[in-house]
Amino acid sequence: MLDALDWARLLLARVNQLQRWEGRCRIKGHALAAGLFAVVMLGLQLWKSWVLLAGYDQGIFQQVAWNSLHGRWFESSLSSQLSTNVVHAGELPFVGYERLGQHFTPTLLLWAPLLGVFGAAALPVVQVGLITAAGLVLHRLAAPRLPARTANWLVVAYFAGNALIGPTLGNFSDLCQLPLAVFVLMLGLLESRWALTVAGALLMPLIREDTGVILVAIGLWLLVRSRERWRLALVLIAWGGGWVVVCTNVLMPLFSDDNSKRFMVENFGQYLGADPDKGSSSLGVLKRVFSQPVLLVQQLIDPPGKTLRYLLGHSLPFLFVPLISLDTWLLAGPSLLGLFLAQGTNDPLAITIRYTWLVVPGFALGALFWWERRAVPSPGPRVRLAWGAALTLSLLLTVTSNPHRSLSMVMPDSISPWVHASPARQWSHGLGAREALKVIPETASVAANTPLVPLLA
């Protein structure tokens, strides 16, 4: 017969067993979210590629990677078509045009060999893989600082955001490397792991000519949150900001005038006065912006509705916590400032395009640090209910927006008038296009509309 003490011990053992089982389930929650995200995103990306829903930018990056793989570094005739020499001067596109004058992206060379292994599927694999890996590193950041449940909720919120899903389903972008670089650098800073710190800090500005701004933001955050490390903070600020200045004013003009005469004009032409077509350097634009404070304030808040929706869209999956976190504004503030001040044919405040990757890491980290500093860093039942509703709403808004027509096989592109092609018809369309391309001689020059560009690149 068991006495009362034996029963108590047995009950305690059972409780401990249940707690360990629950802990294991929670620990696996982030891996399940990452796996589901990767499978769905990659499946949709491959479907888009087959049915010709990938766009011009996808073709550019495939061409750049393929040419670089064969020793023609960063060359792209597709990028030449968009250059200022063609658009403004009326010249013909140039086969040997080097894209570094438009965007300075040395880290693309890391992924060029994969094009020889996976072919056209390489870039979707890289994009989905990097974004998924970033989520796993985010969990590695959160796990020692938050209860298991909160860490898992945070990672699920990261993967459920329209601001992450939308651009992941779009054309390949060099900015898909940014979230992983940010989280790796933060892991190195928080755990004093110098190898990760150096790797993240060195690679981040090399992703694109403007990503050094994120490094400046991290340096500012370090100055505020860890003042005893002010020397390291100043090094990060100097390296990130200095690289942006040198890259845009010295290195890129060596290849072309596209940055000053096209991108600065398209994105910040409203600050350049009566004759913006003359162009300006990044330093010149910065001077013009801050010399017009009334216009600056107007651009920051106008249009107010779109600006507010943009912030709410980023913060919705995190239950709006990033909006009240100082860390968010320190880490994402400089990027938000640039987006709010910019204009362009690609709306900088669209929640489903590549520019959101400049902001997503700051919002995720802002939520993480906010929960870490709470006396009770675990959401209660009511908060979990509200958070679950926010996650559901975020996913619902993402699906109904049909980002980059990724879900066009199950939902119409237009209701009035009704425009929808069945999956079978889309599949046969892609098959027919590939059959048609087989008759083109290998040495022939080719002109094509946008859906065929990735196939020909």
PLM regions and their residue ranges:
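Membrane-lumen/periplasm interface segments of specific transmembrane helices
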Residues: 41-44, 52, 57-60, 231-334, ...
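Short acidic/glycine- and proline-prone juxtamembrane loop motifs at membrane-interface regions
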Residues: 166-175
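Specific aromatic-rich, kink-prone transmembrane helix
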Residues: 137-141, 157, 176-201, 215-223
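Signature aromatic-anchored transmembrane alpha helix within multi-pass, membrane-resident enzymes
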Residues: 31-35, 149-152, 237-241, 374-408
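Transmembrane-helix motifs of polytopic, lipid-linked glycan transferases
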Residues: 113, 121-145, 153, 184
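Short helix- or helix-capping micro-motifs
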Residues: 151-162, 201-205
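Start-transfer (signal-anchor) and selected internal transmembrane alpha helices
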Residues: 1-43, 143, 231-235
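Hydrophobic/aromatic-rich transmembrane helices and adjacent perimembrane loops
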Residues: 128, 132, 329-382
